[in-house]
C-alpha cells in the first residue's frame, strides 16, 4: 500500500514529475548527428575508392563513376528500408548481433560479433588515415610523414579515451552540420560551374590514371561497385542504438535512419556528378574530395574549411569506435566469450583494456597499410558487408516465423538486401584478396574460434568450481605455515610473527648448496638461529643444483602427503623498497619461490611485504 504525502498548501499537480531520463536521450536530429558520423565521414573515401578502380580503364572508365554510384545509392536505399524493419523488430537494439543471436544461433551471432569487432577496428584505421589524407592534401609538405601523423592522431584519441570523456550528442551536431553543410555547398556551387575554377591542389602531383587502359568490363564495374560500397559503413549504427532514443524509440530511430540514407545518398550522387563534370583524375597525395573542393570553390579559405571539417569529422568517427568496441567486448566477456578483464572498468568508468586493445590493433593496421586509406578500404568493406548479410538473412527468418501482415513483402525486401550484400562481399573479397583482403578472410574465423575456445575454457572452469551449485560446508583443517629464510633480520622476525598467527605449526626452511662458501653461511645461520631461539624449527633442505624453488616445492609436497590432512601455506617475506628504481636492487628470490610452489603444489602462497620507509 502506498501513501501519498502532500505538503500544506500544495496539490499533487504541483509536484515535479520524476525524472525518467528521457530528456537525456536522443531525438531524431541529435541521434542523426551522434550516430551517423561513420556514414557521413565515408564520403571522404567512398567516391575515391570508385575512381581508383575505374582509373584502370583510363578516362573512359571514369565516365562510369556516376552509374556505379547510382547502383550503390540503390543498395543504400534497400539497406535503409531493411534496417527500418530491423529497428521495428528489435527495439532493444543490437543490430546484426541481436538478429543473429535470436534467429540464426550462437555460432552465427559470433560471426556477426567478429565482423563488428573488425568493423570497429578498421573504422579507426580508415578514419585516421582518411583524416590525415585530408590534412596532407591541404598541406602537401606533410605527405611523407603521413604514417607518423596517423600514429600521433591515434595516440591522441587513445589518451583522451583513457582519461574518460562524457559523450554528448549535442557536441556532435556542430561538426556534423559544418561538414554536411560544406559538402552540400560544394555540390551546389559546383553544379553551376562548367569547368573547374582551380586545379592548384592537383598541380605537380602524378596522376594514377592508367596509360595502358583496359576495357570497361563487368568485372571492373563489379570491383568498382564493391570498393565504393565502403561508403555504406555506419548504416547499421542507428539500429544498434535504438534504446538511446526518446519514446517512441522505434519511430524516432526509423526517422533518423531514413534521414541518414537521404543525406548520404544525396552527397554521394552529388559528388559523383561533379567528378564526371570536372573530369577529375585520381592523383597521388591529393584526395578526390580535396580536388572537388578546389574545383568548385577555388583554392581559398573555403577549401581549407572543407579539409579541416573533414579531419575533425573523421577524428570523431574514429572516436565512436573507442566508445562502441569496449562495450561490445564487455558484452562478449559477460557471455564468457572473451577474458573477463574486458568487462572491468577503470576509476574513470573506462573499459581500459578494451581501449588499449583497440589502439594496439589499429596501430598495427596503420603500420601495415603505411598510412594509406586505399589499402584499408577493401578490408573495411568485407567486415561491414558480412554483418549486413547476416542481419538480412536473420530478418528473413524472423518474418517467416512471425508471419504477420505483409510478411512476404518484408521477407522479400530483406532477402533482396541479403543477396546484394552477399554478392558484394564475394566480389570485394575475390577482387582484393591478394591486396590484403586475405587478412579479413583469415581473421574472421580465427576470432570466432577464439570466442568459442574462451567460452569452453570458462565452462570447464565453472564446472570445476561448481558454479551454480551449493558448495560443501566449510571445515577446519590442521594448518602448517612454511617460511623460507636465508638470513636473520627484522624481516625474518616479522614473517615468523605473521606465520604464528596464521597456522597451528610454523617451520622455517633454508636451502643448502654443496659449495664451501654456502655451507659456511648455513652454519653461521644455524648458530645464530640457535642463539636467537624463536621457538620455530629451522629445516635444512639440501640441493645439489643451484635451484631455489624446486627443493622448497618438493618439501611442501612431502609434508602435505606424509601426515593427516594439512593445509600448507608458504609465507614468503619480501621487502617493499621506498622508491621505484630500488626494485632493481632486489634479487627476486621471492618471485622464484612463489613460481615454483604455485606450479608444482597446491599450497597457499602468502607474500609478506615489509615496507622500507
Predicted regions and their residues:
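Extracellular loop-to-transmembrane helix junctions
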Residues: 50-101, 107-115, 126-153, 261-269
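Cytosolic C-terminal regulatory domains/tails of membrane transporters and channels
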Residues: 1-22, 460-613
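Loop-to-transmembrane helix boundary motifs in multi-pass membrane proteins
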Residues: 106, 146-151, 244-267, 333-367, ...
Amino acid at each position: 500500500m502506498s501513501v501519498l504525502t502532500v505538503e500544506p498548501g500544495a496539490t499533487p499537480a504541483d509536484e515535479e514529475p520524476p525524472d525518467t531520463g528521457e530528456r537525456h536521450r536522443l531525438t531524431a536530429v541529435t541521434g542523426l548527428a551522434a550516430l551517423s558520423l561513420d556514414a557521413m565521414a565515408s564520403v571522404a573515401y567512398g567516391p575515391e575508392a570508385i575512381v581508383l578502380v575505374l582509373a584502370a580503364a583510363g578516362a573512359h572508365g571514369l565516365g562510369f563513376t556516376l552509374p556505379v554510384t547510382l547502383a550503390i545509392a540503390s543498395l543504400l536505399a534497400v539497406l535503409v528500408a531493411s534496417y527500418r524493419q530491423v529497428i521495428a523488430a528489435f527495439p532493444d537494439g543490437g543490430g546484426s548481433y541481436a538478429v543473429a543471436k535470436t534467429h540464426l544461433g550462437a555460432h552465427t551471432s559470433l560471426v556477426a560479433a567478429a565482423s563488428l569487432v573488425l568493423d570497429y577496428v578498421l573504422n579507426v584505421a580508415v578514419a585516421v588515415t582518411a583524416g590525415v589524407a585530408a590534412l596532407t592534401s591541404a598541406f602537401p609538405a606533410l605527405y611523407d610523414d603521413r604514417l607518423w601523423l596517423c600514429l600521433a592522431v591515434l595516440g591522441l584519441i587513445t589518451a583522451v579515451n583513457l582519461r574518460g570523456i562524457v559523450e554528448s550528442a549535442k557536441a556532435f551536431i556542430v561538426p556534423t552540420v559544418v561538414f554536411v553543410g560544406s559538402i552540400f555547398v560544394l555540390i551546389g556551387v559546383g553544379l553551376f560551374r562548367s569547368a573547374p575554377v582551380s586545379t592548384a591542389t592537383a598541380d605537380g602531383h602524378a596522376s594514377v590514371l592508367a596509360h595502358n587502359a583496359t576495357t570497361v568490363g563487368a568485372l571492373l564495374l563489379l570491383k568498382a561497385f564493391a570498393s565504393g560500397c565502403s561508403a555504406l559503413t555506419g548504416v547499421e549504427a542507428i539500429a544498434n542504438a535504438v534504446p538511446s532514443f526518446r519514446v517512441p524509440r522505434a519511430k524516432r530511430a526509423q526517422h533518423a535512419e531514413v534521414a541518414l540514407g537521404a543525406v548520404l545518398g544525396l552527397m554521394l550522387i552529388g559528388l559523383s556528378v561533379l567528378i564526371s563534370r570536372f573530369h577529375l583524375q585520381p592523383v597521388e597525395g591529393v584526395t578526390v574530395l580535396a580536388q572537388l573542393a578546389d574545383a568548385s570553390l577555388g583554392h581559398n579559405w573555403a577549401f581549407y574549411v572543407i579539409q579541416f571539417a573533414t579531419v575533425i569529422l573523421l577524428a570523431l568517427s574514429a572516436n565512436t569506435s573507442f566508445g562502441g568496441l569496449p562495450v561490445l567486448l564487455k558484452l562478449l566477456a559477460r557471455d564468457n566469450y572473451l577474458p573477463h578483464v574486458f568487462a572491468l572498468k577503470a576509476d574513470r568508468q573506462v573499459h581500459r583494456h578494451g581501449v588499449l586493445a583497440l589502439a594496439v590493433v589499429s596501430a598495427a593496421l596503420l603500420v601495415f597499410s603505411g598510412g594509406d586509406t586505399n589499402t584499408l578500404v577493401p578490408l573495411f568493406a568485407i567486415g561491414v558487408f558480412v554483418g549486413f548479410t547476416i542481419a538480412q538473412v536473420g530478418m528473413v527468418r524472423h518474418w517467416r516465423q512471425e508471419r504477420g501482415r505483409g510478411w512476404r513483402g518484408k521477407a522479400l525486401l530483406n532477402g533482396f538486401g541479403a543477396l546484394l550484400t552477399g554478392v558484394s562481399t564475394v566480389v570485394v573479397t575475390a577482387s582484393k584478396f591478394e591486396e590484403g583482403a586475405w587478412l579479413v578472410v583469415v581473421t574472421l574465423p580465427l576470432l570466432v574460434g577464439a570466442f568459442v575456445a574462451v567460452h569452453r575454457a570458462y565452462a570447464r572452469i565453472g564446472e570445476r568450481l561448481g558454479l551454480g551449485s551449493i558448495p560443501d560446508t566449510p571445515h577446519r583443517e590442521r594448518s602448517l605455515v612454511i617460511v623460507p629464510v636465508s638470513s636473520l633480520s627484522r624481516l625474518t622476525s616479522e614473517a615468523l610473527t605473521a606465520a604464528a598467527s596464521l597456522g597451528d605449526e610454523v617451520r622455517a626452511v633454508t636451502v643448502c648448496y654443496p659449495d664451501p662458501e654456502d655451507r659456511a653461511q648455513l652454519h653461521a645461520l644455524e648458530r645464530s638461529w640457535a642463539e636467537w631461539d624463536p621457538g620455530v624449527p629451522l629445516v635444512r633442505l639440501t640441493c645439489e643444483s643451484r635451484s631455489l624453488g624446486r627443493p622448497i616445492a618438493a618439501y611442501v609436497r612431502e609434508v602435505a602427503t606424509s601426515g593427516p590432512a594439512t593445509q600448507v601455506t608458504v609465507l614468503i617475506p619480501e621487502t617493499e623498497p621506498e622508491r621505484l628504481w630500488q626494485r632493481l636492487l632486489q634479487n627476486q628470490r621471492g618471485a622464484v619461490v612463489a613460481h615454483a610452489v604455485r606450479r608444482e603444489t597446491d599450497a597457499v602462497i602468502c607474500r609478506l611485504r615489509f615496507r622500507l620507509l
